Amino acid sequence: MPELPEAETIGRALKRALVGRRITEVRVFSPAMREPLTPLLDAELPGRRFVDVRRRARYVIAELDDGRALLMHFGMSGVVRVEPADVPKRKHEHLFLVLNDGRAFRFECTRRFSVCKLCRLPEPGGCPPELDGLGVEPLTDRFGGEYLFRVSRGRHGAVKCFLMDVCAQ
């Protein structure tokens, strides 16, 4: 299962590959995932342009020019690729977005535990409401020794469990 560093790396790579690119064609091969891919993607995504890609927790948010975003979580076996559009379809490829530069964004998952869904953003650069319950982002100034000290008061238990719980709030 990709952890935060992998999600950060994937987000940075997708930012370089997608920002400024326009979606020209959409194919949903297999909508059965942890959260089913909607057939509406076929009608709603062509013509949209990627304006930003960022990470929040272990999610990658690929923001579009219409106030929506593709929200991705890679689960245990999710993979994204941006490669030439003429590369043959792989067995576990679920979503295929052809870009205006001749490449394609491909979302694959062998176990179908991943998430790739279209969601509305409350504001440009924001996070989808689905992520409102997540804790403090560990790569920001808000997260540090002082924060951990404050939230650890009155708690007893294993350090790893505490950290996992704090990071999930």
Language model features with spans:
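A cross-family signal for N-terminal binding/gating loops and helix N-caps
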Residues: 1-108, 112-114
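Phosphate/anion-contacting hairpin/loop surfaces
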Residues: 70-169
